Amino acid sequence: MDMHMIVKVVAILAVLFLVYKLWESMNKPNASPLKIQNPYEKYMNSAEGGEYDAEDDDIYYPETDAEDDDIYTGETDDMYDGEDDDIYVQEGDDIEDAEDEPYDDSADMEQDVPKVQQPMMPLLTPSSQLLPKPSPEAADFAQFAPKNLQAQNFLTATQWIGVNTQGSSLKNANYDLRADPIIPKADVGPWMMSSVDPNIYQKPLFG
């Protein structure tokens, strides 16, 4: 018998042994199933039950913890659960209206408001110096502009330029009924050319 045959026989015996142990554990009458321990089992104990873990002292139970009730109602044995509210109520007062009372008087609060300090340096350019000073020449300006000259136009369109002449253009004709007179055609320059053409579409006043 060689070495390979011995190894195969030992492996078969080991497998048969494991199968037998598994079959034996499954056929036991009082065999308990495999149970995994719950890591939160110690925190599931209630203070009202029979079992209580002493390590869970930091768990807060509202029905058993009365250390944080700070409301005093005037009696020695009567305590009101108000969830850590530091409000002292006299006997016979309504607890709901206890927080609505003003803390300070409004007259005392006016004294606590800081006042705005006045600027130490005066203004370099006050508003009174920004306007021109009154002068007698400006006060007598009404003598040079009487009321009868308010609607008078002192500009004459035909005074400085000729009307109906060759060199006139009369672009700003204030007193003409027509737009402007006919621009005459005159070839000027070294090549006898001009860029200004006569207005041949100008209609006469009567015609």
Swiss-Prot record:
<keyword id="KW-0946">Virion</keyword>
<feature type="region of interest" description="Disordered">
    <location>
        <begin position="63"/>
        <end position="82"/>
    </location>
</feature>
<feature type="region of interest" description="Hydrophobic">
    <location>
        <begin position="7"/>
        <end position="23"/>
    </location>
</feature>
<protein>
    <recommendedName>
        <fullName>Minor capsid protein P11</fullName>
    </recommendedName>
</protein>
<keyword id="KW-0167">Capsid protein</keyword>
<dbReference type="Pfam" id="PF23983">
    <property type="entry name" value="P11_C"/>
</dbReference>
<keyword id="KW-0426">Late protein</keyword>
<comment type="subunit">
    <text>Interacts with the major capsid protein.</text>
</comment>
<comment type="function">
    <text>One of the minor capsid proteins that constitute a network internal to the major capsid proteins and outside the lipid membrane. The minor capsid proteins glue and stabilize the capsomers. the p11 zip protein binds together the neighboring symmetrons.</text>
</comment>
<dbReference type="InterPro" id="IPR055730">
    <property type="entry name" value="P11_C"/>
</dbReference>
<dbReference type="GO" id="GO:0019028">
    <property type="term" value="C:viral capsid"/>
</dbReference>
